[in-house]
Amino acid sequence: GATLSGGVNASSITYATPTGSGTDISGQLDLVAGVASSPAQGTSAEAAAAAVAAFANMSNDWYGLYFAASSVLADADVLAVAGYIEGAGVSRIYGHTTQNPLALDQTSSADIASQLKTLGYKRTFVQFSSSNPYAAASIFGRAFTVNFQGSNTTLTIKFKQEPGVAPETLTVSQAAALKAKNCNVFVRYNNNTSIVQEGVMANGYFFDEVHGTDWLQNDVQTAVWNALYTAPKIPQTDPGVDVLLTTVDSRLAQAVTNGLVAPGVWNAAGFGALNQGDTLPKGYYSYAPSVDTQAQADREARKAPVIQSAIKLAGAIHFSDVIINVNR
């Protein structure tokens, strides 16, 4: 075979050379000078964030990111990758496992979970595991089994299991420290069960809501694209805009079917005919102004009026108080 030189630094692949024993077949394999291609010089190992950027530049056809490196990434690399994922134009999620015991210390702010929380990243999550450096990958494995085109298929990450990951036995103060830092953990309870808690991103957003709304964003984009792609043309008229509104609403209806969205009260600022405090009986509402109100530049650019949708997330129950009144 070829001689490989180097190690962590740049390597190169050159011509085959005899080992000094056995039969030299390098000539038969055309691996010798004058026949084989010129030696190929390698490159030094790239930084983690640069590798992610290269993948992103190559393809948009991926969503979850986890480093299965033989050694744990340095905190600086984790922060660089998290920053890239947070600011990228394509929605993705990055997971990281920490084994640093400082994550269990309520007084520490130097651990990676604390640093990511301070930065307020909603597209990165951290899990503490003392035994498994790849524990957070199990959260990806569970979450990405969801088929959003089904009925009642969405789930919350809390209360789930992590096959192959040993549960942690924590003190009350250690559990409180992880929760305060928005650091997930697979933990053993004294009722002989083990669960993932709390199922959150670094900024405290729930994993399932970020995952679910990312799916919805992609699903609506795909549906609107297909409507434009398959029609001979959609006219730049109010009936034409209604075609797009119907397309959007069909995907919002699927979000109700799979359990991401549900009827409820809209508690944010209103738009169109929707006011704050109104009930969304379907769980969603979509609105687009008349094309008559468009700026001439937008009309000449063949843009549709902006379509706005309001959705009420179904959420999930994680805690419950039960009051029992007793009468003798």
Regions found by a protein language model. Give the residues of each.
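Generic structural signal for short, flexible, solvent-exposed coil/loop and linker residues
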Residues: L4, P18-G20, S44, A51-A54, ...
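Short N-terminal helix-initiation segments at or just after the protein's N-terminus
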Residues: A2-G7, G27, V32-A36, Q174-A177, ...
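Helix N-cap and loop-to-helix transition residues
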Residues: A47, A74, T171, T237-G240, ...
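Polar low-complexity, Ser/Thr/Gly/Ala/Asp/Asn-rich disordered segments used for subunit assembly
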Residues: G1-Y134, W266, G270-G272, D278-Y284, ...
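Extended basic-aromatic, gly/pro-enriched interface segments that bind polyanionic ligands
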Residues: N57, S114-L244
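Detector for Asparagine
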Residues: N9-S12, S21-D24, S37, N57-N60, ...
